[in-house]
Swiss-Prot record:
PANTHER family: LIPID-A-DISACCHARIDE SYNTHASE (PTHR30372), LIPID-A-DISACCHARIDE SYNTHASE, MITOCHONDRIAL-RELATED (PTHR30372:SF4). Belongs to the LpxB family. This is Lipid-A-disaccharide synthase. It comes from the Bacteria. One of its GO terms (biological process) is lipid A biosynthetic process. SUPFAM superfamilies: UDP-Glycosyltransferase/glycogen phosphorylase. Pathway: Bacterial outer membrane biogenesis; LPS lipid A biosynthesis. Keywords: Glycosyltransferase, Lipid A biosynthesis, Lipid biosynthesis, Lipid metabolism, Transferase. It is an enzyme of class 2 (transferase). The lineage of its organism: Bacteria, Pseudomonadati, Pseudomonadota, Betaproteobacteria, Burkholderiales.
Length: 388
């Protein structure tokens, strides 16, 4: 990094919890790589704020899932983006890093790039999984892409976008061999007997749509596997309050409801029933058999079905290039089907051993010291724009 008279300024935008995790990891690397006087600001969550990040807006303002669901929030989201764009154009940062949230960030990045501000995007959109013209948007908006998965840079570079594979911070954070015994002690669960972790989502809309179905499936599983225990982590106090009535409505269930501690809950489990998302990668890194599911409103589902061309949605299956764990989506996600599939994952020891091998290979491939790699890439972009 060339000698810097004024403090470096890096603007970042993360729009949801997974982006907050990535942003916090990147900020840790940037604090180690860039001068101590550097400033970091923009939109982020609590993890980013904990590592000297100035959040001008909380990321919850952007964390809206689904095409239809987003419509009611569009005016406020556009207002925030417009105000942030004006701020950044008036006082240009040395670099802008958009963390996932492509619908919000690409338009902003294109405007900033047009004004000569270096733009970096962290998390390549699933151009390998979805139809449409996102690659064209990337070409217009992004100077450099930070990729979580090893096959992505080649796809981007063919389109003329510079890219760096940085791995995934979860692969750095999670040990290769999970401590199931220690996790059960931490949650007050007995060491013996089967435990199933159930994760119905990290948003109110997700829990409202699939939570009742998951709990009905839990009832069936307990009938078919007496002695099974369930642990259900709630991402926030608000979501815990939303889940509590479901727990109360099923008094026969042996269920532990936690606030946060999703990774501990999954570590303690023998099998996992999980709503699709980044958490499925976390489950794979913990070497756990799982069933992946989701339900979205009908119109959102129709749009997603027409845009997608891969036969799977779960990250473990996408990374493996084949179905290694079952997916039950939309109308296929019935309580009976979910119960059967989850109990099969629980009971099949040969499948468990095969998944452990597959998931260990994934873990090693993604364990790349992401914070350092990503920070080095950002520093190179900034340095390349400095006058010599």
């Amino acid at each position: 990094m060339a000698f810097q008279l004024t403090p470096l300024r890096v603007a970042l935008v993360a729009g949801e919890p997974s982006g907050d995790l990535l942003g916090a990891s990147l900020l840790g690397g940037l604090h180690a790589r860039l001068p101590a006087s550097s400033r970091y600001y923009g939109i982020g969550g609590p993890r980013m704020s904990a590592v000297e990040f100035d959040a001008h807006w909380p990321m919850e303002k952007l964390a809206v899932r689904g095409y239809v669901e987003a419509l009611k929030h569009i005016p406020e989201i556009l207002r925030i983006r417009g105000e942030l764009k004006r701020q950044l154009l008036a006082e240009p940062p040395d670099a802008f890093v958009g963390i996932d949230a492509p619908d919000f960030n690409f338009g902003l990045e294109q405007a900033l790039r047009g004004a000569g501000i270096p733009t970096i995007h962290f998390v390549c959109p699933s151009i390998w999984a979805w139809r449409g013209g996102r690659i064209k948007k990337i070409v217009k908006a992004v100077d450099h892409m930070l990729c979580l998965f090893p096959f992505e840079p080649e796809l981007l570079e063919k389109a003329g976008v510079a890219a760096t594979f940085v791995g995934h911070p979860l692969a750095d954070e999670i040990p290769l061999e999970p401590d199931t015994h220690g996790a059960r002690i931490a949650l007050g669960l007995p060491d013996g007997g089967p435990v199933i972790a159930v994760l119905p989502g990290s948003r109110r809309s997700e829990i409202e749509l699939i939570g009742p179905t998951f709990f009905d499936a839990m009832e069936l599983m307990q009938q078919r596997e007496p002695g099974v225990r369930f642990v259900v982590p709630a991402a926030t106090p608000v979501l815990r309050a939303l889940l509590q009535p479901l727990v109360d409505a099923h008094p026969s269930l042996s269920v532990t409801l936690t606030e946060g501690r999703a990774q501990v809950a999954m570590t303690a489990a023998d099998a996992i029933l999980v709503k699709s998302g980044t958490v499925t990668l976390e489950a794979a890194l913990l070497k756990k058999p799982m069933v992946i599911s989701y339900k979205v409103p009908w119109l959102t589902g129709q749009i997603m079905r027409r845009q997608g061309y891969l036969p799977y949605v779960g990250l473990p299956n996408i990374l493996a290039g084949r179905f290694v764990v079952p997916e039950l989506l939309q109308h296929f996600a019935t309580p009976d089907a979910l119960a059967d599939a989850t109990l099969t994952q629980l009971r099949d020891d040969a499948n468990r051993r095969a998944l452990t091998d597959i998931f260990t290979d994934m873990h090693l491939a993604l364990r790349q010291n992401t914070a350092q790699r990503a920070a080095e890439a950002v520093a190179r972009v900034i340095d390349s724009r400095k006058p010599r």
